[in-house]
Regions:
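WD40-repeat beta-propeller superdomains and closely related acidic/aromatic-rich repeat-like regions
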Residues: 1-233
């Protein structure tokens, strides 16, 4: 199994090779074959709709409907994929140092480039007004508050360090995010003014994962050397 995704209603999706699978409730497994190895999976925030990222685009699939899946093309290898919380945009992290997106109302393309390295971690801020990303020596936040998303706009850059961001996680309710870095540093950052709180001093190994609890009262981190931490707010 290469990828997994969970739906708030309890459905689960996973992929193996070129095939994506979905199981919802007591229903039988349903599967979809795509043209190449699945790079990432994401459920839409409303309804049972699954985005399947792969080489040269993303396939949008309603497992419980007979309609043909919709294909969103863009040349290149698409890995992580995410819907915006308002279901208006779809964004992928690519094998190259870039993001690609589509405005779902008309499938208009959105290019988000300029990264020095591959984007391996993406997270929507509370309310979905911005998308926080790794891949640079600061957290890059692309604006999605308007109907055009980030098209024609410059991203914000917060929490710069002399080392690359490896993981990001946004607080579920407040305009706060956590950032993990290649040197093991973890910062908590307030988006309004960029104020930073040091959660974990550089420990040597890169931060591999960050996560908030559902209520936003706990922040956890894990590093590539096996170290982990839990912060209670």
């Amino acid at each position: 199994i290469d990828n997994v995704a969970l739906h708030p209603d309890g459905a689960v999706a996973w992929s193996a090779g070129k095939t994506a699978f979905v199981r919802s409730g007591k229903d039988q497994e349903k599967s979809l074959d795509v043209p190449s190895t699945v790079g990432g999976l994401a459920f839409a925030p409303k309804g049972l709709r699954l985005a399947v990222a792969h080489y040269n685009g993303v396939t949008l699939w309603f497992p419980n409907m007979a309609a043909e899946p919709e294909f969103l093309p863009w040349t290149g290898s698409h890995l992580a994929v995410t819907f915006s919380p308002d279901n208006k945009f779809l964004v992928t992290a690519m094998h190259e140092a870039a993001l690609h997106g589509w405005r779902l109302a008309d499938n208009r393309h959105m290019r988000m480039t300029g990264y020095p390295g591959r984007v391996r971690s993406i997270a929507w801020t509370a309310g979905g007004k911005a998308l926080a990303t790794s891949g640079a020596d600061a957290v890059i936040l692309w604006p999605f508050a308007s109907k055009d998303g980030p098209m024609g706009k410059e991203p914000a850059m917060l929490a710069p360090l002399k080392t690359r961001v490896t993981a990001v996680a946004c607080h579920p309710d407040q305009a706060i995010f956590a950032a993990g870095y290649e040197d093991g540093t973890v910062l908590m950052v307030r988006m309004a003014d960029g104020a930073e709180i040091l959660v974990h001093r550089n420990g040597g190994a890169a931060i591999a994962a960050l996560a908030w609890s559902a209520k936003g009262t706990l922040l956890t981190f894990a590093a590539q050397d096996g170290e982990a931490g839990l912060l209670t707010l």
